[in-house]
């Protein structure tokens, strides 16, 4: 897009983003114990007839490499009565609309909306959640039926994909809330990081809880699969 002469005060220069984003990714990986081994950063600027054209946003890709056994890579089929579990951090006004905001021009939304869409990292909580998942995978019998990360759309996306066509009911009063000013929509749709959604066999819940306590990872049983092919969130007052 056309680069104007005035840059919004909340924006960073491409150079700052290239340096700080790269440093931030490797810093998080080191804190978490997962080295950053590949990635790239890219920006572009071009002057033509006294007008400057360039990327409004810098592109950064980063990643690591891992492996898993075939047994632990294939998801199981949800059955009625499976427990829906969330492991990790609380809900905050973080990452709201992150998937949408990242796909439009900078400045399209208000600064408040764009700030709420920005992610905040917590490497320690990520490590705790990771330790629980790894411990369960390394057991002789893996009690995890299915697992999903909390990406775009938060609980709405994660938990609905966990229960799949089996259907499920989520008790919103069981979801951990770190900011009491959150609305119901913000609670179920925020993208606060360092959380995993798991589908656990009912008889294994207490065992999983002990593993989570050992790793100091907050664990919440927030609902269960229903078998009625419907997915719903229910508030404390019974409203769905």
Model feature map: region roles:
Residues 2-9:
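Short, small-residue-biased leader/transition segments that mark boundaries at the very start
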Residues 59-70:
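Short, structured beta-strand/loop micro-motifs enriched in basic residues and often containing a Trp
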């Amino acid at each position: 897009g056309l680069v104007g002469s005035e840059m919004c005060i909340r924006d960073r220069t491409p150079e700052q983003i290239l340096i700080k984003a790269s440093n931030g990714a490797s810093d998080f990986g080191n804190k978490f114990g997962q080295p950053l081994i590949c990635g790239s950063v890219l920006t572009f600027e071009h002057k033509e007839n006294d007008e400057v054209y360039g990327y409004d946003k810098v592109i950064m890709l980063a990643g690591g490499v891992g492996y898993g056994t075939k047994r632990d890579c294939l998801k199981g089929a949800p059955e009625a009565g499976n427990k829906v579990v969330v492991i990790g951090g609380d809900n905050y006004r973080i990452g709201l609309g992150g998937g949408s905001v990242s796909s439009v021009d900078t400045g399209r939304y208000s600064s408040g909306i764009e700030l709420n869409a920005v992610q905040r990292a917590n490497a320690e909580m990520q490590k705790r959640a990771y330790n629980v998942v790894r411990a369960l995978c390394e057991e002789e019998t893996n009690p995890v039926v299915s697992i999903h990360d909390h990406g775009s759309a938060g609980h709405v996306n994660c938990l609905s994909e966990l229960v799949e066509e089996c259907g499920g009911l989520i008790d919103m009063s069981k979801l951990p809330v770190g900011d009491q000013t959150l609305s119901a929509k913000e609670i179920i749709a925020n993208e606060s990081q360092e959380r995993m959604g798991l589908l656990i066999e009912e008889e294994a819940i207490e065992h999983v809880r002990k593993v989570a306590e050992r790793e100091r990872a907050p664990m919440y049983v927030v609902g269960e699969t229903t078998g009625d092919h419907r997915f719903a969130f229910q508030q404390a007052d019974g409203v769905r």
